């Protein structure tokens, strides 16, 4: 089932690199959804978790992962851990060589994600934190890449500050006509923003 889904994403031009393709084929999405949704794990759509959160659709996970151009040795911050699936895909995309710090505001979700990641062997590559993702994780900054999996009103200044020079942030931003996914690149004091597509995420709390 995973193979068919990934082939479709490849055909649609969403999966572009071997790294992301391999990561999606390696991470068992059914292990990151609630038991009642296991049969739907390889449908290309978001699925409910709890506390109003969702696990992102596979095409969105693939797209965001491709946009940061994953490579071994990267230090990545994820804001909005959810069930831990996206962090696991990123871990595989960097070949588990590097570190992913992920922060979740809902304590029950942070615990759920940590249990999933530990059970599946991602402990030591992925670190889960409970806290306010808008503030980032100053103690581990700067980051090569930041992925935000909830829609912000504005790009949080703390996240821009914690991005390495030349680093990439992928973030959905709430705008007048809807949410827009941006690829943000930091160049010294300048920020380059590129609109990618319209999206629909839960709000960044």
Swiss-Prot record:
Gene3D superfamilies: Vaccinia Virus protein VP39. Its EC number is 2.1.1.77. Transmembrane segments: none annotated. It catalyses: [protein]-L-isoaspartate + S-adenosyl-L-methionine = [protein]-L-isoaspartate alpha-methyl ester + S-adenosyl-L-homocysteine. CDD domains: AdoMet_MTases. InterPro entries: PCMT (IPR000682), SAM-dependent_MTases_sf (IPR029063). One of its GO terms (biological process) is protein modification process. Pfam families: PCMT. The active site is at residue 56. Keywords: Cytoplasm, Methyltransferase, S-adenosyl-L-methionine, Transferase. Coiled coil: none annotated. Belongs to the methyltransferase superfamily. L-isoaspartyl/D-aspartyl protein methyltransferase family. Catalyzes the methyl esterification of L-isoaspartyl residues in peptides and proteins that result from spontaneous decomposition of normal L-aspartyl and L-asparaginyl residues. It plays a role in the repair and/or degradation of damaged proteins. This is Protein-L-isoaspartate O-methyltransferase. It comes from Pyrobaculum aerophilum (strain ATCC 51768 / DSM 7523 / JCM 9630 / CIP 104966 / NBRC 100827 / IM2).
